[in-house]
């Protein structure tokens, strides 16, 4: 066992350390420990290394102690070692990611598993050298669970909520809560609204700790419009002179963003570009599969993409000017062209093959658009070397005469965006990850300078930039707060209501003391404060860090696992009707009825085999209702027996009400099987809208108002929702949201309109 495995943090200290991704970009993997809970954040590989050397330092920690693993997004440096963790180590925790991330994850890693090799020795069986196999990938995939944005889940006392992070489709930042301490893990995030993704969200709840990326350190991005213009102009210039342009990209993420830019530019400049004489290709083994995911999750993208999809009824990711290449055998390399090829780091694959083919010609261009990790060919190429080694035989060098340029479209925050976001979060502890040492060090200095005015105060901000496998221990004083539940809450609500009523009638005693010299008055206000003393049982749930104050009468309802006395109740009532009539009424009221004894076969069901050996009396009927309440009828005497609890008590009360009223019930006097004679006409449009508006009334209560002029049937029917500063205007006649200043609320209203149309209207 190593030092990391042996040391356990003090119960009042939150411990953070990285197995990868600290003071480096690649193999992101971070560990959080607090109150006996352990979770891992991301499980990536280092793109500049191969085999076991590319993994985080998993041998430095006992992975069997991990309760939960959260994956922020599908990029290889954040998710590619997940199958290794799940199948090749003693990890036994649960794994969560968003739905789009899981959809992309398997395809991306299926391709990756073909090139991950531990040994480089020729003649070895590569199937035995891979970090993991296709079978490992399939088995791990089945164990991965998904989480929706803005939903909160709990695993072994660890609560976590997913929020939009921008960056790529499906990327999430997680706000984690353990024993009242909240930690925000941003993963890779972007605060810039691009052509298809929204910017990262600010969680509504504050955080005590933020684990934030520092990829670009203190650098500032050029405005997006300028970068797009430079990109298109540079490519246009090269292809106009007969050159070829290679854009190494990740298979998913920035590739789709750049394709949206180029497809629009090619569409607007057809004549200048020879009406299709300069083709654009997207070369990736996963090209079509990846694009199908983007076409599926259009509704999770920004308003611009959704509007295009809705207005034109065509998917924006079905490109008019871009063709797909699965391999270079299909590629006819004649004349100028633009090639987007993966992988983005140029370490191997299609992008590396094209680089080696095109780099000897001066008229060609390699344009790097993403972040380049130290040690990769993409980073090396930016130094403009005279030659590059062949990927298939490193002893052979290839002259590099092509142009090399960089216009970054990497979806990472710059310094200004990062600082603004950190200030909005307001955490007093900042942990920097995902950045090379120098940019990260500069960012730390800038943050400390920015928050220097808070030094030596209660709100002092601490900034950490630990190296891999170095602990950061943060102390949190344990404040125990009990949560009142059940009847105690009702008593307190009643007391508060009474106090509010009394406050309006309360007289404030004013004592005037006159100063004879100045004739000024002093006023002293005397206020009486009433207090309410409540009593109950304090229940501690150490697993989930909950402390609850529960009334004795509510104890069994809220904490069924506690040992309590079970009471069985029995009541008897005389009947003046046949058991057949009672059985009919019971079946009408309750769907869950099991027949134990039926001597006269009134139920037309077989008797439970367990009771065939028991002595049965003439005309006896015994049934079990809702799984617990037993009703026995024999000789016109009904006996009701049940175990005392909230649900069974309610069921027993209902059954007893039936027994006492069965003789006089209208249905008992006359049971009709005929259909009614009157006509059911189809409801008009106004009635349907009224029914749909009931869905909104249930969801939003008094904040929803429907404007309906029943005298003028041609006037459009509208409704409004007012939630504080957030307002929305809905046109029910057209079933659209006309105005809304909140995207989350707008999405929710659109979903309700669809539900109302599909479910409520057809029933009208």
From Swiss-Prot:
This chain is encoded by the gene named: YSH1
Pfam families, per this entry? Beta-Casp, CPSF73-100_C, Lactamase_B_6, RMMBL
Specify the superkingdom.
Eukaryota
Q: Which residues bind Zn(2+) 2?
A: 77-78, 188, 434
Source organism per UniProt: Kluyveromyces lactis (strain ATCC 8585 / CBS 2359 / DSM 70799 / NBRC 1267 / NRRL Y-1140 / WM37)
Q: What is its main location?
A: nucleus
Q: Name one GO cellular component term.
A: mRNA cleavage and polyadenylation specificity factor complex
What is the name listed in the Swiss-Prot or TrEMBL entry for this protein?
Endoribonuclease YSH1
> What family name appears in the similarity comment?
Belongs to the metallo-beta-lactamase superfamily. RNA-metabolizing metallo-beta-lactamase-like family. CPSF2/YSH1 subfamily.
Q: What does this protein do?
A: Component of the cleavage factor I (CF I) involved in pre-mRNA 3'-end processing.
Q: Which residues bind Zn(2+) 1?
A: 73, 75, 167, 188
Q: Where in the cell is it found?
A: Nucleus
